[in-house]
Curated annotation (Swiss-Prot):
Pathway(s): Glycolipid biosynthesis; lipid IV(A) biosynthesis; lipid IV(A) from (3R)-3-hydroxytetradecanoyl-[acyl-carrier-protein] and UDP-N-acetyl-alpha-D-glucosamine: step 2/6
Cited NCBIfam families: lpxC
Requisite cofactors: Zn(2+)
Function of the protein: Catalyzes the hydrolysis of UDP-3-O-myristoyl-N-acetylglucosamine to form UDP-3-O-myristoylglucosamine and acetate, the committed step in lipid A biosynthesis.
Sequence positions that bind Zn(2+): H79, H238, D242
SUPFAM superfamilies to which the protein is assigned, alphabetical: Ribosomal protein S5 domain 2-like
UniProt organism field: Histophilus somni (strain 129Pt) (Haemophilus somnus)
Name listed for the protein in its UniProt record: UDP-3-O-acyl-N-acetylglucosamine deacetylase
Entries under InterPro entries matching the protein: Ribosomal_Su5_D2-typ_SF, UDP-acyl_GlcNac_deAcase, UDP-acyl_GlcNac_deAcase_C, UDP-acyl_N-AcGlcN_deAcase_N
Gene Ontology CC terms: membrane
Similarity-based family: Belongs to the LpxC family.
Catalytic activity of the protein: a UDP-3-O-[(3R)-3-hydroxyacyl]-N-acetyl-alpha-D-glucosamine + H2O = a UDP-3-O-[(3R)-3-hydroxyacyl]-alpha-D-glucosamine + acetate
UniProt cross-references to Pfam families, sorted A to Z: LpxC
Active-site residues annotated for this sequence: H265
Length: 305
């Protein structure tokens, strides 16, 4: 049986909020089987919880933001969510003492280290997957994203920025998902932004914690980070990281083929909602026999960073 997974123990880290620039403490705690992914604002009295849910995503302007019925929000959840998807964590309580998850280095890699440091524990309950049964496609102008049936989780992402530093050879990335592939190929890819956009955001009191330490920054001609890129196609890899985090907002690893062109948080979320709303397009599946599970979801004995 492929089992649900949680953490062996709680673990805590301190970082900076991307938009506030303030110190944020993040605590990750184990959770019982069938709990799912629960975000919790501990700076509120009483604490406010946000179960990971595609319909709770109500603001995708700059990041993926969960907002409850009372208008309380928790922002920048996508990189941590991607790490949870990457390692197949089904049940976890995520406590944060601020309105946003710390940005860390702008990638999912620090969260991978954190989760592996806490240790991953299998629970004696079958893990549920969402299997895509029929094609679903969402379009917005020339942007689009789609799911198709596939025995595994395949991702194909294309970006299209007219910029001297983003050549045509680094605009597409394709990956057959597995924990190992995610950790090595995707988790280290950092978020990116353009200097003119960042200056505008900061004038509006946003992105105050943004810096060359937690983002790739481009001016009109080049990449400003002294150490350059971690991968030549780091930008499109980060967009794939975002998509993996956005699609895990349903709380279940997906079995299907995801393909996107110029998609962002908003379109990723619309695609996930469209899938879930069409009862004939998907089904829950569990695997009693490890021989039946799609190759990418066979849990490795250990993940090499």
């Amino acid at each position: 049986m492929i089992k649900q997974r949680t953490l062996k123990q709680s673990i805590k880290v301190t970082g900076v909020g991307l938009h506030s620039g303030n110190k944020v403490t993040l605590t990750l705690r184990p959770a019982m089987p069938n709990t799912g992914v629960i975000y919790c604002r501990t700076d509120m009295n009483p604490p406010v919880t946000f179960p990971a849910n595609a319909n709770a995503v109500r603001d995708t302007m700059l990041c993926t933001c969960l907002i409850n019925e009372d208008g309380v929000r928790i922002s920048t959840v996508e990189h941590l969510n991607a790490a949870l998807a990457g390692l197949g964590i089904d049940n976890i309580i995520i406590e944060v003492d601020a309105p946003e998850i710390p940005i860390m280095d702008g990638s999912a890699s620090p969260f991978i280290y954190l989760l592996l440091d806490a240790g991953i524990e299998e629970q004696n309950v079958a893990k549920k997957f969402i299997r895509v049964k029929k094609p679903i496609r969402i379009e917005d102008g020339d942007k689009w994203a789609e799911f198709k049936p596939y025995d595994g989780f395949r991702l194909d992402f294309t970006i299209d920025f007219e910029h001297p530093a983003i050549g045509k050879d680094v605009r597409n990335y394709v990956m057959d998902f597995s924990a190992q592939a995610f950790v090595q190929q995707i988790s280290r890819a950092r978020t990116f932004g353009f200097m003119k956009d960042i200056e505008y955001l900061q004038s509006q009191g946003l992105a105050l914690g943004g810096s060359l330490d937690n983002a790739i920054v481009l001016d009109d001609y080049r990449i400003l980070n002294e150490d350059g890129l971690r991968f030549k196609d780091e930008l499109v890899r980060h967009k794939m990281l975002d998509a993996i985090g956005d699609l895990y907002m349903c709380g279940y690893n997906i079995i299907g083929d995801f393909k996107a062109y110029k998609s962002g948080h908003g379109l990723n979320n619309k695609l996930l909602r469209a899938l879930l709303e069409n009862q004939e397009a998907w089904e829950f599946v569990s695997f009693e026999d490890k021989e039946e599970i799609p190759q990418g979801y066979v849990s490795p004995a250990q993940v090499f960073i």
